[in-house]
């Protein structure tokens, strides 16, 4: 977001497995530069509904807590005029965000991460284990994506701007 910082949204599909850990597949990646927290909240809520998400995990450390303040409030989508309801916080042990709950609240739509050194170490270890066991899948290479896209009529008919926008997630990973 703000102060020259970039906001990243990674959309993962989590597929439960009969045995062992779920398979996590990166579906898409979105990036915004220097957006106001309210604009970020609107963008995240749009993606939440577009992908029928179960949970939005938000980095609530530092400036991230400002984003949370907008996520727990309603917004009107400036493009569609639709109400984007407030998001409830799943791990609100202190009950701080319960006071923002309304009849329209998207219950437990957010999980807040407030990382510290021990959590960072645990997360790093977990991700390394998941990567080495093939439980996390990323997008295909940018060149492979471009070849696949250009082999379709849709891809061939896209102008350069639309093609670049389509390929952006593959470029970023």
Task: Name each region found by the language model.
Residues 1-93, 121, 125, 137-173:
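RNase H-like, metal-dependent nuclease domains and their acidic two-metal-ion catalytic environment used
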Residues 106-130:
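Conserved RecA-like P-loop NTPase helicase motor core
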Residues 88, 93-99, 105:
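Generic extreme N-terminus detector
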């Amino acid at each position: 977001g703000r102060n020259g910082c970039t906001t990243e949204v990674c959309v993962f599909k989590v597929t439960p497995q009969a045995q062992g850990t779920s398979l996590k597949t990166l579906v898409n990646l979105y990036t915004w530069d220097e957006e106001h927290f309210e604009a970020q909240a609107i963008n995240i809520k749009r993606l939440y509904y577009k992908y029928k998400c179960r949970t939005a995990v938000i980095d609530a450390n530092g400036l991230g807590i400002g984003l949370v303040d907008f996520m727990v409030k309603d917004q009107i989508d400036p493009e569609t005029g639709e109400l984007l309801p407030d998001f409830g916080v799943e791990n609100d042990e202190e009950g701080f965000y319960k006071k923002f709950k309304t009849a329209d609240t998207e219950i437990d739509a957010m999980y807040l991460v407030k990382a510290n050194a021990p959590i960072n170490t645990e997360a790093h270890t977990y991700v390394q284990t998941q990567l080495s066991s093939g439980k996390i899948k990323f997008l295909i290479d940018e060149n492979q994506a471009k070849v696949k896209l250009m082999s379709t009529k849709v891809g061939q008919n896209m102008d350069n701007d639309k093609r670049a926008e389509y390929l952006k997630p593959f470029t970023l990973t």
